[in-house]
Amino acid sequence: MAHLEAKPADGTRAGGSRSAGRTGGRILADALKTQGVTHVFQVAGESFLGLLDGLYENRSAIRTITCRFEGAAVNMAEAHGKLTGRPGVAIVTRGPGACHGSIGIHIAQQDSTPLVLLVGQIPRGDMDRDAFQEVDYRNFFGGMAKWVTQIDDAARIPELIHHAFQVAVSGRPGPVVVAIPEDMQTDTAEVPDGRRHTVPRILPDPAAMAEFKRMLGRARRPLVVLGQGAHWTAEGRADLAAWLVANDLPAAVGFRRQGILDNTLPVFVGDLGNGGDPALFAKAKEADLIIAIGSRMGEPVTQGYSLFAPPRLDAPLVHVMPDGGELGRVYQADLPVQADLNAFAAAARATVSVEPRWRGWTSELRANRMKWSGEVPAYEGRLNVAAAMKELSAMLPEDAIVTTDAGNFSAWGVRFINYGPGQKLIGPSCGAMGYSVPAGIAAKVLFPERTVISMVGDGGFLMNGQEIATAFHHGVNPLVMVFNNQMYGTIRMHQERDYPGRVSGTALTNPDFAKFIEAYGGHGEVVQDTAEFRPAVERALAAGKPALVELRMNPDQITTRTTITAMRAAAGLKAKPAKKPDPKKAKPTATSRGRTAKAAKPKKR
């Protein structure tokens, strides 16, 4: 049983004699080790000093990554979950720290990412007094997290931490929040370590697989929709790809899920997310069988529920999800299948094979994808971002990791980069800005030998760009690619659509981003012309230090398909392009080699 009085973290009593057992902080750190944790992402706070001391004792097994902002720390843990399939772990302090970190909980919930957030808490005796930085975490996180608890007894730490990890990976994966009062961390208790959590693997019902085969045999225009990226294993993706190719089944991915399936396969037909191909959206409406595997068929994937209107589709729906609670929640499937996605892929590969009567359909969808991603439009301006992304696609190593932020800029990569079987793309499907830089740092911490590119807009970069300091602190070298169009692009697009020509609150004034990273000691590049892109990226990758490549875009080119000028013309307004920077008033900038040009001396008045 835990002693309720606080004791020094080394386990000694005030009189100098040594007490039995371990401190709560040490038990907690040991419990994380038992659950297989290798990294924790944190911003230090006095409310979890006991845990930090326990992590010091476990420093050979668990690497503590010190971040500069709690929101970024939780984003890093969320990226860990996406990249490994195992729960990422973040630690934040009470009150403000927890509030800052909540964005990562929202991302993990929307993206079905396993994550455990440990939150320092005020002493137990001060509860319900509106004490300094007191927050009721059950109420605060209850609508986003799968489970929220508080550990008040040090003896229960192994039990509750095991359960936290079990909940995070079970069914539909997601975030769990555990509050840890600071005085509990200095209590001592004699308690054995718990068991490591296990990932439940629900096998598909053979009868359901037989019915699925019958439904597939009747189809002429089937379409597979893939989702839930963190749930897939390498083996599962291999089984999935083999089954799709063997049956010539056209497969589209959900919003920011291109990493699930090799984009070079003849059955990959594109992305159903924001900024996707209108031709694919039109064809999706013609499908006579929808096979949703791991996709919740949410708002971005269905284009605001316009492609597939709930609750019942016009075409039969086979819906495969690991959590039975997700089946029938929005869409009433003709064949709901509760199964681990990897187990379903293996079973489908082994048992569901039919003579494809849709080869022409698949070929048409694939041809549309190749046209959409292969043809480089002749955009106005010196820098053709489409050509740059095609160049980047060819440059990426076979095991590259790309992280993306929220914003219109991301559509350029989605359209013009084809991800191979060993490459990964991760990003927030909920539109959370400020994700990509922390996610890229986490990726480089986890996989230091792999090339990591963090793509982010100018708006999103300045939400978490300070985490470049974290990359330097921990000796990792991601490459950040800033798409600079001097505005909150997505919001501006909506603004021009609904209130054409009435620009309000969406324009931005930016620093020299190359100088920004140079101030940290990194390598900066500025790209203003298409021909400058490849050499700049090559220099950045070879720099041996954190690097940043700024792409100075034509602000008028608001999406891959249209301009602000065209949107205003369609609204009946006189064409007036977005304001471009005045070179006479421009601040001194970095050259394409990252060196700083000298500014002209100001004239005397």
Predicted segments, located by residue:
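Active-site diphosphate/adenylate-binding microenvironment
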Residues: G25-A29, K33-Q35, E46, L51-Y56, ...
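Phosphate/pyrophosphate-binding active-site segments
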Residues: A2-S19, A155, V191-D193, R214, ...
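Active-site nucleophile and cofactor-binding loops and adjacent substrate-binding regions
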Residues: Q42-G45, T64-N75, A90-G97, D152-D153, ...
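Active-site/binding-pocket entry motifs
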Residues: M184-T186, N408-S410, P555
